[in-house]
Swiss-Prot record:
It comes from Pseudomonas syringae pv. syringae (strain B728a). GO terms for biological process: DNA metabolic process. PANTHER family: OLIGORIBONUCLEASE, MITOCHONDRIAL. Its EC number is 3.1.15.-. It comes from the Bacteria. The lineage of its organism: Bacteria, Pseudomonadati, Pseudomonadota, Gammaproteobacteria, Pseudomonadales. SUPFAM superfamilies: Ribonuclease H-like. This is Oligoribonuclease.
């Protein structure tokens, strides 16, 4: 059910960091309520890319995405960038009215840059504001360096979103005092 207070969490895995030369290879979404309770998990989509495109990945991306199995999932996928955008938009429309939720995640500006370049209809669904958990991470590192949130590092989209939500819960409990 749509609610203006629901939050859209998104994570992308890409072939690199430049939206003009790199592409999205995986995306996932989660909807939470304003208290960070998960309401629904959206589709986890490996976006098909050609072998030629995948061969352009740098060493880190080649190793990381190859080791996680993502590169193989991308090769085997039949889902185009446009289809991935449409499936994700169809899911979030069930939960959040247009332009009411900030885009939520870790280092979310990077994801937003890729959405703007490759999935503009989806990017336009979000409010112009960002809810970036990495802002709190940076502030905690400077103002309360004893606070440490332990993260995994699968670099798979759904795992990364779950970690981002857990990390925001951690900062809410230990860093943001009522």
């Amino acid at each position: 059910m749509q609610n203006k207070q629901n939050l859209i969490w998104i994570d992308l895995e890409m072939t690199g960091l430049d939206p003009d030369t790199d592409v999205i290879i995986e995306m996932a979404t989660i909807i939470t309520d304003s208290e960070l309770n998960t309401l629904a998990e959206g589709p986890v989509i490996a976006v098909h890319q050609s072998d030629e495109t995948l061969a352009k990945m740098d060493e880190w991306n080649t190793r990381q995405h190859g080791g996680s199995g993502l590169t193989q999932r991308v090769r085997e996928s039949t889902v185009s960038m446009a289809e991935a955008e449409a499936q994700t938009l169809e899911f979030i429309k069930l939960w959040v009215p247009e332009r009411s939720s900030p885009i939520c995640g870790n280092s979310i500006c990077q994801d937003r840059r890729f959405l703007y370049r490759h999935m503009p209809t989806l990017e336009n669904w979000f409010h112009y504001r960002n809810l970036d958990v990495s802002t709190l991470k940076e502030l905690a590192a400077r103002w309360s360096p004893e606070l440490k949130f332990k993260k995994g590092s699968t670099h798979l989209a759904l795992d990364d979103i779950r970690e981002s939500i857990a990390e925001l819960r951690f900062y809410r409990e230990h860093f943001i005092k009522p």
